[in-house]
Every structure is written in C-alpha cells, then in structure tokens.
Curated annotation (Swiss-Prot):
Protein name: Putative uncharacterized protein YIL071W-A
More about this protein: Partially overlaps PCI8.
UniProt main location, coarse: membrane
Organism: Saccharomyces cerevisiae (strain ATCC 204508 / S288c)
Keywords recorded for this protein, A-Z: Membrane, Transmembrane, Transmembrane helix
Subcellular location: Membrane
Topology in membrane: Multi-pass membrane protein
GO cellular component: membrane
TM helices/strands, residue ranges: 66-86, 94-114
Amino acid sequence: MNNKVTLLPPRVFFCLSWSVMVNIDRRKSDRSVNLDDQHSNKPPSESLISLLSLTSSMSISSLLSLLIIVAVLFPPLYISGLPWIMSFKSVFSFFSLSITSFIMVPFLLISLTILCKIELSSKCITSPSISKFNCPDIINFVNSSLISSKSIPSVDDK
C-alpha cells in the first residue's frame, strides 16, 4: 500500500503534463496553419501576436516534455530492488513530492496563465467587436513591451 502512495505523485503529474502538452501541440499546429494561410491579410501587430503565441507554446511544450522525463525517471527508483535505494525510499518520495508540488505545479499554472493572456489578446485582435476589452490598448501594450524602439502600426492604422 505504501509503494502505491509513493508512486502516485509522479504518475499523476505525468498524466496531467502529457494531456496539457498534447493540447498545446494541437493548438500549435492549428495556429501555424492559420499563420501560413492568413499571413498576407493580417496587419503587422496581429502577425506579431500570432508569432509570439506560437513561440511561447513551443517553449512551454518543450519544458513540459523535460518535466515529463523527470517524472518518468522517478518511478524506477522506487521499484528497483537495490538495498541502498530501498533504504532511502522515504527521501526519494519526499523529494518527488516536493518537486511535484512546489516547482512543477506552480510552473504549469504560470505557463498556462501566460498562454491564456496571449490567447486573450489575440482573440481581441481577431474580433475587435468585443465590447468589454479595449483592443487598441492591448495592442499598444503588447507592441510597447515587445519592441520599445520601433513603432508597429496597430489595427486602427490600416
């Protein structure tokens, strides 16, 4: 019973990060198709937001794959029959639990929050009729934070 409890956090994290990475890869492929198809019709600020969102999703999926490798490497330490690993079993279980709860889960939440903010600003650009968001303010904020010296024309400048 105790072995199943120690195996739970890495496997739960593996399933969670795998599903998130599959969803990000699916959205990344959809976004790259849209970026190739509609690149000539988009204003420069919208293309920049799409490119930024694509780059951030690629970096998030690569970091998640690294974390999946870490989560997969922990269970063989538990189930191997070496006596020195079995004597340090509580240390390994505490280590994997602390990594899962204190580093990986907040990192996942921060990454998903950043991705949702980029997604919100790109939706605001693609549909300017949204009434509760001020789309030019979001475009100007993203433009000024990305490139401070150059000025990128916004959607209103067309």
